[in-house]
């Protein structure tokens, strides 16, 4: 037993394995740790057809790495599009086209019935009856916070540990910091040491590298139907480059860069500084 005056709870998260029949077969894997990567590298040696369940950033990155190994790869996504809610429709279309040009099959709006096989994976059966051939399945279906210890200790938790603006839990002196969230950790550590800092939520952003392209999306990219956004777009379909900026009340609120992300730092700063449409047009 280790007595403490202050404690920081930072046990991270684990890959979510959906309750699909066959998810325990030897050729079904997740990719989160170095050990996971080493296991997949070994499985790839005897595989020809791979299925990635999940069409988010990590799923597409996994699909690309498997394709580079020479496997036939299919991505299965339950949502109507890849990266649902994370990027806008023009970007989805272009990114899907890039993936298909690289030989990756994309199936969206599908539900998984089971992973087929007895001792080895033989395919993934869809709810509609179709079976996608596979001898390797990668699950990329999100993560879940590790909250069992927190709950046992009496910390309030929902899908994650619940904290206030100081990153303190419902138990005085115990703080929690989110998985891979450096700023959260800094605030929690400072407050545990006696400071009184408040956490300021960061602007949501995602980045993707693979399939010979790169993607960066940040902020509000037109996801709220009630807001009359203005958009500015620069598109080069031949070179598969897209820049799209979203404005609300004349202020930059979000942006997407595809194919050329060299200006991501500039765009991030512009959103933080609440640059106007006029100011941004002057830089185009």
For the regions a protein language model found, what residue spans apply to each?
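A Rossmann-like FAD-binding core segment of flavoenzymes
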Residues: 2, 68-165
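Short hydrophobic core segments
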Residues: 2-14, 53, 132-142, 185, ...
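Redox-cofactor binding/interface segments in oxidoreductases and associated redox assembly factors
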Residues: 9-10, 52, 126, 139, ...
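Glycine-rich dinucleotide-binding loop and its adjacent helix/turn
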Residues: 11-69, 163
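FAD-site-proximal beta/loop scaffold in flavoenzymes
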Residues: 24-45, 119-125, 130-191, 281
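Mid-to-C-terminal Rossmann-like scaffold of FAD/NAD(P)H-dependent oxidoreductases
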Residues: 172, 180-261
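A short, polar/charged loop-to-alpha-helix boundary motif
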Residues: 261-280
């Amino acid at each position: 037993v280790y007595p403490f005056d202050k404690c920081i709870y930072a046990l991270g998260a684990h890959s979510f394995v959906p309750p699909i029949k066959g998810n325990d077969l030897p050729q079904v894997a997740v990719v989160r740790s170095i050990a996971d990567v080493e296991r997949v590298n070994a499985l790839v040696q005897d595989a020809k057809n791979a299925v990635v369940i999940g069409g988010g950033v990590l799923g597409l990155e996994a699909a690309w790495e498997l394709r580079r190994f020479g496997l036939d790869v299919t991505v299965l996504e339950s949502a109507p599009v890849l990266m649902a809610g994370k990027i806008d429709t023009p970007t989805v279309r272009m990114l899907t086209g890039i993936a298909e040009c690289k030989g990756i099959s994309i199936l969206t709006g599908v539900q998984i019935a089971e992973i087929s096989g007895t001792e080895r994976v033989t395919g993934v059966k869809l709810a509609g009856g179709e079976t996608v051939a596979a001898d390797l399945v990668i699950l990329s279906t999100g993560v879940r916070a590790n909250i069992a210890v927190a709950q046992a200790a009496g910390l309030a938790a929902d899908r994650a540990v619940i904290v206030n603006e100081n990153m303190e839990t419902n138990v005085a002196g115990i703080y929690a910091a989110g998985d891979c969230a450096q700023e959260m950790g800094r605030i929690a550590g400072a407050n545990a040491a006696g400071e009184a800092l408040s956490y300021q939520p960061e602007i949501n952003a995602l980045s993707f590298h693979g399939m010979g392209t790169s993607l960066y999306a940040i902020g509000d990219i037109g996801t709220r139907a009630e807001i009359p956004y203005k958009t500015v777009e620069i598109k080069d379909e031949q070179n598969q480059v897209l820049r799209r900026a979203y404005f609300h009340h004349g202020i930059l609120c979000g942006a997407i860069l595809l194919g050329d992300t060299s200006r991501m730092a500039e765009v991030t700063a512009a959103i933080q500084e609440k640059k106007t449409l006029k100011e941004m047009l002057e830089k185009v």
